[in-house]
Every structure is written in C-alpha cells, then in structure tokens.
Amino acid sequence: MIKSELVQKIAEANPHLYQRDVENIVNAILDQIVDALAQGDRVELRGFGAFSVKQREARTGRNPRTGKQVDVSSKVVPYFKTGKEMRERLNGAA
C-alpha cells in the first residue's frame, strides 16, 4: 500500500472528511514523525510501534560491480520496532 492508497482508504472509511483534508492530516503526521526523528527523538505510537534513529558506524564495504573496497561513512538510519498489539494482530492472536 502506498500513501495515496492509505489516504483513499481513510477517506472512504470517514465519508464526512474530504480526501484532501485526510491527505493533509496524513502528511502532517508523517512530517511530525520525521521532524522528531531528525532531532533524535523517539516516536512511540502505543500498540503500533516505535520509530527511532540509530547511528550506523563507518565501515569498509565492497562495490558489488567491481569488487573494489570502498569506505562507507557513518550515518543515522531510521529504525522501527513493532508494538505488541500489532505483532499479536499480525499473528492472529487478537
């Protein structure tokens, strides 16, 4: 499912909302999550999961095309850990 499909499903489930309003809300939520992560904060949505960032250390990698070793610098990467309720629903317990 892509973002536009998510917006459409939410709009269909809530006929009192305009699709463009739903799109604005979804975009605002995602922007706030990204902004919080950019500041190094953790974003927890109880039952759904938690977004955080982790520091990936610098390492020596390999170019798969040439086989040549390359230095890969350290970077911050997003991380998502699923919540208990989501895991239970996905595994049919709920």
Curated annotation (Swiss-Prot):
| Top-level division of the source organism's lineage | Bacteria
Q: Which SMART domains match?
A: BHL (SM00411)
Q: Kindly list the GO CC terms recorded for this protein.
A: chromosome; cytosol
Q: Does the keyword Isomerase apply?
A: no
- Gene3D superfamilies found in the cross-reference section: IHF-like DNA-binding proteins
Concerning SUPFAM superfamilies, the annotation shows: IHF-like DNA-binding proteins
User: What InterPro entries does this protein map onto?
Assistant: Hist_DNA-bd, Histone-like_DNA-bd_CS, IHF-like_DNA-bd_dom_sf, IHF_beta
Residue ranges annotated as coiled coil are: none
Q: Name one GO biological process term.
A: regulation of translation
CDD domains assigned to the protein according to its UniProt record, in alphabetical order: IHF_B
Q: Which UniProt keywords apply?
A: DNA recombination, DNA-binding, Transcription, Transcription regulation, Translation regulation
Instruction: Tell me a Gene Ontology molecular-function term this record carries.
Output: structural constituent of chromatin
Q: How does it assemble?
A: Heterodimer of an alpha and a beta chain.
Instruction: Sum up the protein's function in the record's words.
Output: This protein is one of the two subunits of integration host factor, a specific DNA-binding protein that functions in genetic recombination as well as in transcriptional and translational control.
What's this protein's name?
Integration host factor subunit beta
Organism annotation: Azorhizobium caulinodans (strain ATCC 43989 / DSM 5975 / JCM 20966 / LMG 6465 / NBRC 14845 / NCIMB 13405 / ORS 571)
Highest lineage ranks of the organism? Bacteria, Pseudomonadati, Pseudomonadota, Alphaproteobacteria, Hyphomicrobiales
